[in-house]
Structures are given as structure tokens and as C-alpha cells.
A protein has these predicted regions:
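Alpha-helical scaffold segments in soluble metabolic enzymes
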Residues: 17, 46, 71, 135-142
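ATP/NTP phosphate-donor binding region
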Residues: 1-56
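A short, small-residue-rich loop immediately preceding and capping a beta-strand
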Residues: 51-85
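A glycine/threonine-rich phosphate-anchoring loop and its flanking beta-alpha core
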Residues: 75-165
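Short glycine/serine/threonine-rich phosphate/pyrophosphate-binding segments
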Residues: 11-14, 62-71, 89-93
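A short, well-structured juxtamembrane/interface segment
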Residues: 1, 165-166
């Protein structure tokens, strides 16, 4: 059984179509989260609970929803694939997830990469423009963050790990 996870912003854009196409060869359950879903500890726990009876997940959405499914399936040892609906981040295929902790801090945590990432350019092209702007910012800041972390390690002796950048 597959869980096709989308949100109220992406279910009509692509979620329902993906679920319909997959239902031809697998038992599919559509799970729809609110459009303002954040990747935080309570939402990850809810995702694990709502998808626990499924063998794998198909996420149809942008950054927060994708990271929520990514981390939930990582913790459960299940596989997932991603249908990106906007160019809002550069981490769809990454082995890390951005999670907001209980203390309010957002951090990158080890997770696992999807088995595949699919992008329908027609869907991404009509996504709100601010999502594309966010993705550009995400892509531009990554190398700067890597250099700053490495420099702090070399100059101040703080820890450094290459893994998030691989």
C-alpha cells in the first residue's frame, strides 16, 4: 500500500492526478495535510502515524511537506519518492531534512534521499512566484553556508561535517 501525501495547496495541482495514476497498479491512500504544514517534531509524529500502515510514501509538494515525509520515512525505514510542485528549495534529492525543533530552532538533520524525484515543469511554472524566489535564495546560500561553517571550524575549532553537502 502506498500513501500519496499532498497538502491543500498541491492536491489539486498534482496530488490527485498522481494518486489516480498510481492506483492502477497499487493500493493507494490519499493523505492531505493543511497547506501551512511545517516540518517539525509534532508534524513528523503525525505523518508517521497517518502513514504507518503503508509500505512506502509518495510526497506531492514543496519543501516543508517533502522534508516531513523524508524524515518520517527515514525514521521508519520506509522508502519514498517525491513529486516536486515548486522550485522552492534545492533539497528534494538531498539526504538531509530541515526540521524545526521543539525549541523553535530550524536545523538540518540526517535523513535519506528519495528513490526518485519527479518534476512536472507545467506545475512548477504556475506555482506562486515567491516559491521560485525562495528556491533561488536556497541555492545561493548553500555554498556560503558551507564556507562559513568550514571557516569557523578552521579558525575557531568548531565541529564540521562534510555529509550535509555531499
Amino acid at each position: 500500500k502506498l500513501a500519496v501525501v499532498s497538502d491543500t495547496n498541491t492536491v489539486e495541482a498534482m496530488g490527485r492526478r498522481v494518486a489516480k495514476e498510481l492506483s492502477g497498479w497499487a493500493d493507494v491512500e490519499e493523505i492531505i495535510f493543511p497547506g501551512n504544514t511545517h516540518c517539525d517534531e509534532p508534524t513528523i509524529a503525525l505523518m508517521k502515524d497517518r502513514t504507518r500502515h503503508c509500505d512506502g510514501c509518495v510526497v506531492v509538494g514543496s519543501g516543508s511537506l517533502s522534508d516531513t515525509v523524508k524524515y518520517a520515512t527515514f525514521e521508519d525505514g520506509r522508502k519514498y519518492v517525491s513529486f516536486a510542485t515548486a522550485g522552492s528549495m534545492n533539497g528534494y534529492g538531498a539526504g538531509t531534512a530541515s526540521v524545526t525543533l521543539a525549541n523553535g530552532y530550524k536545523t538540518s538533520v540526517s535523513a535519506h534521499a528519495p528513490r526518485a524525484v519527479f518534476v512536472d515543469l507545467g506545475v512548477s511554472a504556475v506555482a506562486p512566484p515567491w516559491l521560485a524566489a525562495a528556491g533561488l535564495g536556497d541555492s545561493l546560500c548553500r555554498p556560503t553556508a558551507q564556507v562559513e561553517w568550514w571557516a569557523a571550524h578552521r579558525l575557531l575549532g568548531t565541529s564540521f561535517a562534510q555529509t550535509p553537502f555531499d
